[in-house]
Amino acid sequence: MGEHIYKGRKLELLIPASSLEVLKIAVIYGADAVYIGGEAFGLRAKAKNFTLEEMKEGIEFAHAHDCKVYVTANILAHNYDLDGARQYFKELKQIGPDALIISDPGMFTIAKEELPDIDIHISTQANNTNYMTYQFWWKQGAKRVVSARELSLNEIKQIREHIPDEMEIETFMHGAMCISYSGRCLLSSFMAGRDANRGACTHPCRWKYSIVEESRPGEYMPVYENERGTYIFLSLIHI
């Protein structure tokens, strides 16, 4: 795979890893970095996730292969989360991840206090849709901001032009297509009683849907999707 350089900095291929086995596979096959979640404070409650011992082993393995490891702590925290988060960050300090991925300002504040020497990346969960937001997080001490999935390539280019060269932009290339906005999805809570903002998303954005017209109960009109958009009645109506 050829290298792509921006102002002397190579673009980074970042891969999610749901287990120690997946982490090692991603590293062996050439990932520049992987991101992982612990048993709390991340948004992948259904994944196996990592114990602290597994994190330590994974970080040591990755570093031995010149690969970075980022740890997610990107829940939208409630009051009862904060003391546990502080203790968790103290434990993470002992195993040395390369960065934390955070969305909540309260969690950000605790992380800066407990891990002042570790980079912080601002999660897509924080709704990062404009260059002023990026500038704000840079002033707070964030190293990288993850673009909202709603952004076009042109919008990302405009952001790049308005932020310091040293600041990093991360962009998703595939995966869930969150709405309302970029991760702060209410569909899972509404439809399945499982809160996406607490790591229990059922991914209703990936389900297949039909439309029912009010006066025709029981008559289901399928919804189609292709690279050009989403359709009902195929060529008749474009959503």
Predicted features, each with a name:
Residues 13-16, 34-36, 69-73, 100-102, ...:
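Hydrophobic faces of well-ordered beta-strands that scaffold small-molecule active sites
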Residues 145-151, 162-235:
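Flexible C-terminal active-site loop/helix
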Residues 46-56, 103-115, 150-164:
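Active-site-adjacent beta->alpha loops and helix N-cap segments on the catalytic face
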Residues 35-54, 73-81:
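Glycine-rich, proline-tolerant flexible connector loops at the mouths of alpha/beta enzymes
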Residues 237-239:
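Conserved small/polar residues in nucleotide/adenosyl-binding loops
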Residues 26, 104, 137, 171:
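Conserved, mostly hydrophobic/aromatic
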Residues 4, 67-136:
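N-terminal active-site wall of soluble small-molecule enzyme domains
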Residues 6-33:
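N-terminal basic/disordered segments at the start of proteins
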